[in-house]
UniProtKB/Swiss-Prot annotation:
Belongs to the chaperonin (HSP60) family. GO terms for biological process: protein refolding. The keyword Cell cycle does not apply. The lineage of its organism: Bacteria, Bacillati, Bacillota, Bacilli, Lactobacillales. One of its GO terms (cellular component) is cytoplasm. It comes from Streptococcus thermophilus (strain ATCC BAA-250 / LMG 18311). It is an enzyme of class 5 (isomerase). InterPro entries: Chaperonin_Cpn60_CS, Cpn60/GroEL, Cpn60/GroEL/TCP-1, GroEL-like_apical_dom_sf, GROEL-like_equatorial_sf, TCP-1-like_intermed_sf. ATP binds at residues 29-32, 86-90, 413, 476-478, 492. Keywords: ATP-binding, Chaperone, Cytoplasm, Isomerase, Nucleotide-binding. CDD domains: GroEL (cd03344). Its main location: cytoplasm. This is Chaperonin GroEL.
Length: 539
């Protein structure tokens, strides 16, 4: 296919038009008085949202060169969302500001490479100062404030803070659609995996069809149990203790399953068998997780162990296990705190190195199950459109809250970015490097300017007053008052603010240093054939 090529100022100008189109669409959502954007969907009702990355992903421009600019900004939003989970609109606004100011200087003859060096130095200084002024998130109230600011709902803030308190900061918190109108929180304590009993005759409660095992022993193996003789000595030892037994194995089949069921029905022995969760290497890892949590040893050939080698010391323990037809929940495993902590650290290190989104999700699930449990926020709303919008807001709030716990918080509403301006201005740079620094100084004001504009105020007036106010004092655009932002609960996670600035500067620098852009030439459509006269065809 033939290519269309633009050079230097023409190339940059075309891309900047795309940047402006996308940024102008996204930035109307910024701040407490931000508006919504309605997105047409191919099927079903339109989506109404104020989520920056969701809007950015939907924008596709007809002009190829403009579309490249728009896609680069969309990448900024996506990258910020991946790293911090929020701050996508701020990142978009910062990108537009850096590109706009940078383009003026490049057009006037400044060297783009020098400008990029200055931008990088200024951003590094700003990030360091953000870390200096950051405050740790120390309690449940602070967590609730972060979530409430991000979701624009105090109720959502309470749900998220309670969920994190119940399942821990590393715990899994999932967001599902509720069947009712109300949003509610449900917490599953302990480790849960999606495998149920192998026979319904193993239940202890015939009405609820669940098996409740109090203070059970737990056998963990990746082997298939088909011959009862393999585990008979172990069963006899467990029988002497009068305690129930949970068997987690690759499968229990052949004569072994009916023998276990028969003993259960006769009341000789309370035993429940379930299949091991996961598949392949992931199954081995999950079995090891269960073993660490319960203090068991996995009976596996990898350790040179056979089923006949299993002893009472090989078994794990827990205060309670509940098994239904689809899932198993292990509560308060008897594994040592040190072993669990080491396992958690191992999974965290794997999380840092993995590049697969699927692997990352599964590792986070394993981490949460070891850390204490799973919380589910069930989102309810009057209509499907409202439900989708609410779900997106809660996802943003959850991500922002995790980021706040990780790196701390700063004054929200763009205030922290203005607070670091003085430190960035101290950078001793010359020539085009100094120009790059000045571009960042101007861009750092832009989020506050846009928040003020969306709320109906003059941004320049707000900026001037903010620069002369104590650090942490800012403008509450929701009611027009000047307040201590942190005390008033208007806060942003450092990770969100930092990621937005770093990603914006990175992509903006790429656009400013672009000298040629290559795009596919649009195909010329052939003219439609003229209609044929039926009389000419013998009719």
């Amino acid at each position: 296919m033939a290519k269309d090529i633009k050079f230097s100022s023409d190339a940059r100008a075309a891309m900047v038009r795309g940047v402006d189109t996308l940024a102008d669409t996204v930035k109307v959502t910024l701040g407490p008085k931000g508006r919504n954007v309605v997105l047409e969907k191919a099927f079903g009702s339109p989506l109404i949202t104020n989520d920056g990355v969701t809007i950015a992903k939907e924008i596709e421009l007809e002009d190829h060169f403009e579309n490249m600019g728009a896609k680069l900004v969309s990448e900024v939003a996506s990258k910020t969302n991946d790293i911090a989970g929020d701050g996508t609109t701020t990142a978009t606004v910062l990108t537009q500001a850096i590109v706009r100011e940078g383009l003026k200087n490049v057009t006037a003859g400044a060297n783009p490479i020098g400008i990029r060096r200055g931008i990088e130095a200024a951003v590094a200084a700003a990030v360091e100062e953000l870390k200096v002024i950051a405050q740790p998130v120390a309690n449940k109230e602070a967590i609730a404030q972060v979530a409430a600011v991000s979701s624009r709902s105090e109720k959502v803030g309470e749900y998220i803070s309670e969920a994190m308190e119940r399942v821990g900061n590393d715990g899994v918190i999932t967001i599902e659609e509720s069947r009712g109108m109300e949003t509610e929180l449900e917490v599953v304590e302990g480790m849960q995996f999606d495998r149920g009993y192998l026979s319904q005759y193993m239940v202890t409660d015939n009405e609820k069809m669940v098996a409740d095992l109090e203070n059970p022993y737990i056998l963990v193996t990746d082997k298939k149990i088909s011959n009862i003789q393999d585990i008979l000595p172990l069963l006899e030892e467990v029988l002497k203790t009068s305690r129930p037994l949970l068997i987690i194995a690759d499968d229990v089949a052949g004569e072994a399953l009916p023998t276990l069921v028969l003993n259960k029905i006769r009341g000789t022995f309370n035993v429940v068998a379930v299949k091991a969760p996961g598949f392949g290497d992931r199954r081995k890892a999950m079995l090891e997780d269960i073993a660490v949590l319960t203090g068991a040893t996995v009976i596996t050939e990898d350790l040179g162990l056979e089923l006949k080698d299993a002893t009472m010391e090989s078994l794990g323990q827990a205060s309670k296990v509940t098994v239904d037809k689809d899932s198993t929940v292990i509560v308060e495993g008897a594994g040592s705190a040190e072993a669990i902590a080491n396992r958690v650290n191992l999974i965290k290190s794997q999380l840092e190195t993995t590049t697969s989104e699927f692997d990352r999700e599964k590792l986070q699930e394993r981490l949460a199950k070891l850390s204490g449990g799973v919380a589910v926020i069930k989102v309810g709303a009057a209509t499907e459109t409202a439900l989708k919008e609410m779900k997106l807001r809660i996802e943003d709030a959850l991500n922002a809250t995790r980021a706040a716990v990780e790196e701390g918080i700063v004054a929200g509403g763009g205030t922290a970015l203005v607070n670091v301006i003085a430190k960035v201005a101290e950078l001793d740079l010359e020539g085009d490097d100094a120009t790059g620094r000045n571009i960042v100084l101007r861009a750092l004001e832009e989020p506050v300017r846009q928040i003020a504009y969306n709320a109906g105020y003059e941004g320049s007036v707000i900026i001037d007053k903010l620069k002369n106010s104590p650090v942490g004092t800012g403008f509450n655009a929701a009611n027009g008052e000047w307040v201590d932002m942190v005390e008033s609960g208007i806060i942003d996670p450092v990770k969100v603010t930092r990621s937005a600035l770093q990603n914006a500067a990175s992509v903006a620098s790429l656009i400013l240093t672009t000298e040629a852009v290559v795009a596919d030439k649009p195909e010329q459509k052939a003219p439609a054939a003229p209609a044929t006269d039926p009389g000419m065809m013998g009719y």
